[in-house]
C-alpha cells in the first residue's frame, strides 16, 4: 500500500489489513492469527510525504485507518500488486461469467503467492513455501505464467536443504519442524517433470536429477517392504471433507496416498533418466516402479483391480496415477461416489486436483462438468457466489450467513485448489501437450450443454496456441491457432484432422 500524507512532525499514519469483513460488515482480522499486518509511519513534517513498505508485503482486500492526520482522500492511497517478474502466458474465457471469475481468482491467488517463493498464503503468520501446495498447482502455474525460472530457483533451494537421508522438507526454505511426507516431498520430482513438459527444457531435469534419486531412495528405505511407503508422518488427504470430526486429515488411507506418490516419483525419476540418457538408471527406476505398482495392487486393490477403500480421493489417485489395469470399473466406482454425494466432492488437498481429470479422462466428462459448475458448497463456484476474488483454503471459509469456518486455519488466499484451472485449458478447450514444450500437441475439446462458447490460449516456447469453439445450429464452430514449427492433432465428435502452423476455422456437425 502506497500513501501520501501531510502533517506536522510526529504525526502518525497507522493502518492494518484484512481479507474479509464479518457478517456485520466489521473489519475482520482473527484469521490472521498472530500476524498484525500493521503499518506505522511517523511524519517528519513539512512537505507532503509519500511512503510504501519496502521489506514486507500484505495479502488484503481492505485496510483500516487507525491514525491519520488531517482529511482523508482516497486519491492518497494506492494498492500495488506484487509478484515475481514473470510473463503472463495464458488466456481463458467462456460463456459462464462465474467460471470466468473463478479463473481470475486463480490468477490473483497465483500472483499474490508467487513472490520469489511459492507460498501457501500471503497474509497470516505463515507465508511459507509449502511443497505440497506447489506440486498440486504446478501444472496450472506453468500454463498461467512462465514459472520456469522461479521454480528452478526454488527447487535448487529444496536440493540445498536436502539432508543426507534424502528427504525433502515440507517447507522450502526450511522454516520449522522436521516433518516431510508424501505429496509434499514429492514436489522434488513432480515440479521438474511438469516444468519440462510445459517448456521443453531438460536442464531442470539434469539439475534436479540427483535430488529426485535421493528422494526415491529415501522412501525406499523407510519400511520393511521397499515397495510400499507405510511408515512415518503423513499429512494424508489434508482438509478432506470426509475427515472425522475434529481432524484435518481426510478419510483416505494415508499410506495408500504415500505409496501412490512413491510410484509417481519413481516413474518421474525413470522418465528423467531416459531423457538424460542415463540408461542403467532408467532401467533401475523403471523396474522399481513396476515393483511398487505391483505392491500397491496387492495392498490396496481387489483382485479385479478396483480399490479396496472406497473414497473419492483413493479412486481418483488410482485413476490419475495409472495404478490399475481396470480403469473402467474404478471410474464407475468414483462416479458412483460422486453421484451418491449429491454430485459433490469430499476430496482434500491431495484428491481435489485430480478428481476432475480422473472423471473426464475415463468417460465421465459430464460429471466432471457437474463438479466444476456446481454453485453450492462444496464447490469452486461457491466462493465466487460469496464474492471471492482469490481461492480459499476451505470450501466454506465464509458461510452463507456471514460467519466464518474457523479462526485458526481460514485463509482466503490459498492457491492450491486453483489447480482446477488447468482443466479449463486441457479439457474445456482441449489443449494437451503431446511432446515437451508443445512441440506437438492435441486439441480435443470437451463440450457441454451448459456452455455456449469457450476460448483458451497458451503462449508456448514456439508461439501462441489457441483453441476456440462456439456452438452453432447443427454443430460447433472451431478456430484453432498452431504456432510455427509445431504440429497439432484435432479431434472432436469423431472428426479428426492433422494441422501444421497456421490459423484454421471450420465447423463440425453434431
Model-derived segments and their meaning:
Residues 1-19, 66, 131-161, 192-202, ...:
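Alpha-helical support elements that line or immediately flank enzyme active sites
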Residues 1-124, 132-133, 149-152, 158, ...:
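Extracellular/oxidizing-compartment recognition motifs
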Residues 9-23, 81, 93, 209-221, ...:
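Acidic, mature catalytic/reactive cores of soluble proteins
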Residues 23-24, 366-510:
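Non-catalytic C-terminal accessory modules of carbohydrate-active enzymes
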Residues 23-36, 145-247, 376-402:
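Helix-terminus loop motifs that line ligand-binding clefts
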Residues 28-30, 36-39, 45, 119-121, ...:
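The feature captures the catalytic groove of carbohydrate-active enzymes
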Residues 68-76, 99, 142-155, 162, ...:
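Structural helix-adjacent loops and short alpha-helical linkers that scaffold large soluble proteins
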